Structure formats: structure tokens, C-alpha cells
């Protein structure tokens, strides 16, 4: 499984990269706003900074919701850096835009996916990634991880090349469950990635080793 970090915070991206396990970054307008990055030019400069840190896939989302606007923004974003993946919402014009980008060799991430049907359309349009939102489905008492598994099975059945990028991951439990159902990628906050390290037996075992070492070596 690949690990992407879901943030626009440069310090967190650098910390995740320094762990040696980071495969990419996902961003969205809300994450940009959280970092106080305003204006188109400032946001695009920020994407370039992220690309320089990770040297890997960085999903940058279009703001437009109409076909022509998404095409214009997507081409501008893709021109910023070869690692940019254009993030497009799963709406009718978005699917059309993904098809266009696919034909132009521009990689895409179909976002805001909440059903197998949406994931099917994204794959048929040639999306590089599809992003089912695990946590948001859980919030309304639906099975987010179950959807990820359903999409994985569908893609394998029909040999679609679109990668399943599990998004809206809230915790380590979500990550492990997405691993178990075969997601290609999990994008998550830094806290969830670091949380995978935590286990009481690791802590107690390390403490015991150090205590025993001191007994022998003083």
C-alpha cells in the first residue's frame, strides 16, 4: 500500500517525508484555507513547494465545477510540475474532464466518491486515482471501508487500472481496515500515520531491554 499525507502543511509533509514512508500528498481547498493560503497564485506556488519536498504525486484540486473551467484550471495545474495530479469532483462535467485529461496524458484523481457507480464512471473515464471518502460515509452511518472493498473488487473483476485511494481516513483503524480490503493508497493525516507505530508491547519491550542492558553494563 502507498501512503499519502492529506494536508497542505509543509512542516507535516516534511515530517512524513523524513519518516521514509511517504508516497505522495493530497490537498483540497479546505486544507489550503486551513493553512491561510489565499489567492490562485499563492496556492500554485504552494503546490510547487510541496512537489519539491516529496518528489512524488501531489493531488491539486480544481475549483471550477463546469467543464470548460475544469479543463482550464487542470491544464494550468498540470503545467506547474510533472508530479501534479489534477483532482476533479465526481460530477458529470468532472467525468467529462477526466476523459479529456486522460486523452491528453494528464493524470487525475476523481474525488468526492461515495458509491460504486461513481467509481465505475471514474474508471471508465480513465482516472488515475479514485477517492472514496471513508470517514464521511461513517459519519452518516454508512460503511466507508466496505465501499473501498467493493470498488477494489469491481476494478479487479473488470481489470480497470484506476488505483483506489482511500480518503477521509480519520485514524489508524481506518488505515488497517483499508489495507485488509486491498486499497492501493491511503491518504491520511500525519497523526494516523504516526499512530501505526504505537503499541504498548513495543514500549514495554523496549523499556525491558534497556533495563536489562543497564543491569549488565552498569
Curated annotation (Swiss-Prot):
One molecular function GO term is: transaldolase activity
The record's section on Pfam families has: TAL_FSA (PF00923)
Q: Which SUPFAM superfamilies match?
A: Aldolase
**InterPro entries documented for this protein:** Aldolase_TIM, TAL/FSA, Transaldolase_3B, Transaldolase_3B/F6P_aldolase, Transaldolase_AS, TSA/FSA_arc/bac
Name a single GO cellular component: cytoplasm
Pathway-wise, it operates in:
Carbohydrate degradation; pentose phosphate pathway; D-glyceraldehyde 3-phosphate and beta-D-fructose 6-phosphate from D-ribose 5-phosphate and D-xylulose 5-phosphate (non-oxidative stage): step 2/3
Q: Which CDD domains match?
A: Transaldolase_FSA
Give the E.C. number(s).
2.2.1.2
Q: Which reaction does it catalyse?
A: D-sedoheptulose 7-phosphate + D-glyceraldehyde 3-phosphate = D-erythrose 4-phosphate + beta-D-fructose 6-phosphate
Alphabetized PROSITE patterns for the sequence: TRANSALDOLASE_1
A single GO BP: pentose-phosphate shunt
Q: Where in the cell is it found?
A: Cytoplasm
Q: Superkingdom, according to UniProt?
A: Bacteria
Q: What is its main location?
A: cytoplasm
Q: Which residues form the active site?
A: 87 (schiff-base intermediate with substrate)
Q: Which Gene3D superfamilies match?
A: Aldolase class I
The record's keywords, sorted A to Z, are:
Cytoplasm, Pentose shunt, Schiff base, Transferase
Quote the HAMAP family the UniProt record gives: Transaldolase_3b
Q: Which PANTHER family match?
A: FRUCTOSE-6-PHOSPHATE ALDOLASE 1-RELATED, TRANSALDOLASE
> What's the stated role of this polypeptide?
Transaldolase is important for the balance of metabolites in the pentose-phosphate pathway.
Give the UniProt family note. Belongs to the transaldolase family. Type 3B subfamily.
* Annotated protein name in UniProt: Probable transaldolase
Q: From what organism does this protein derive?
A: Bacteroides thetaiotaomicron (strain ATCC 29148 / DSM 2079 / JCM 5827 / CCUG 10774 / NCTC 10582 / VPI-5482 / E50)
Which lineage ranks, top first, belong to the organism behind this chain? Bacteria, Pseudomonadati, Bacteroidota, Bacteroidia, Bacteroidales
Q: Which gene encodes it?
A: tal
